């Protein structure tokens, strides 16, 4: 009888866990749909800002201020600023592992070339995975849950802008998971500085950059860096929710399979007990 009690307790526990995983699956699905809409709405903006920056790359150095040139020219220093986006929470499969593995491989490759590294880490999981081995490289760490997304973007942007203006970094690379579908997230690294010309865009006249005065290009650079961080952050968040939704769906299905097996085991145990009791009753009756 104690075995039956243990089985019933375990079935109850698994059913309780299944309710939690199902709820998490539904929440992630809802968040994913909402963020996908935001990404779709921002695609046109990203395309426009990329084209404008590509046009600016065609301008000569004398047309740019000294401060502006710093964002387009490769600096003599070999210091790389790596911005790593991960999640605050787990329960999302291989989501964090894939991007952290890529970052570690790139750090090893860059250091072997004699280049220096600075890290800006967004997300608790990334910080926990990198702090032990690369504590000396970490410049900043942001807990996403404690900072509103827009404030986070502004803080990271200011870190980047100051580092470039002070000639502290030569390259800025952002690491994030790019969303393909709920089951597939692509670990992605994107070089955002120095700004380079895109071959996909044709060159247009530079006259219209002068209409708003000498600060127009500086403002565009600010918008460009902001847009790149925002895009990567949205992609990373929707990828996280997709990965968590898939992981929780698998967990829910596994819980359902486990419940079926436990119920079958419970029924067989009950049947064995009943059969044993019947045999004992029949044997007792025959003895009388």
Swiss-Prot record:
- Give its localization: Cell inner membrane
User: What is one Pfam family matched by this protein?
Assistant: ATP-synt
Protein source organism: Rickettsia prowazekii (strain Madrid E)
Membrane topology for this entry?
Peripheral membrane protein
Q: Which GO terms describe its biological process?
A: proton motive force-driven plasma membrane ATP synthesis
What does this gene product do? Answer: Produces ATP from ADP in the presence of a proton gradient across the membrane. The gamma chain is believed to be important in regulating ATPase activity and the flow of protons through the CF(0) complex.
A GO molecular function term, named singly, is:
ATP binding
* Name this protein carries in UniProt: ATP synthase gamma chain
**Transmembrane residues, as ranges?**
none
Q: By its UniProt entry, which InterPro entries does this protein fall under?
A: ATP_synth_F1_ATPase_gsu, ATP_synth_F1_gsu, ATP_synth_F1_gsu_CS
A GO cellular component annotation here is: plasma membrane
Record key words, sorted:
ATP synthesis, Cell inner membrane, Cell membrane, CF(1), Hydrogen ion transport, Ion transport, Membrane, Transport
Subunit structure of this chain's protein: F-type ATPases have 2 components, CF(1) - the catalytic core - and CF(0) - the membrane proton channel. CF(1) has five subunits: alpha(3), beta(3), gamma(1), delta(1), epsilon(1). CF(0) has three main subunits: a, b and c.
What the entry lists under HAMAP family is as follows: ATP_synth_gamma_bact
Family from the record: Belongs to the ATPase gamma chain family.
**According to the lineage, what is the superkingdom?**
Bacteria
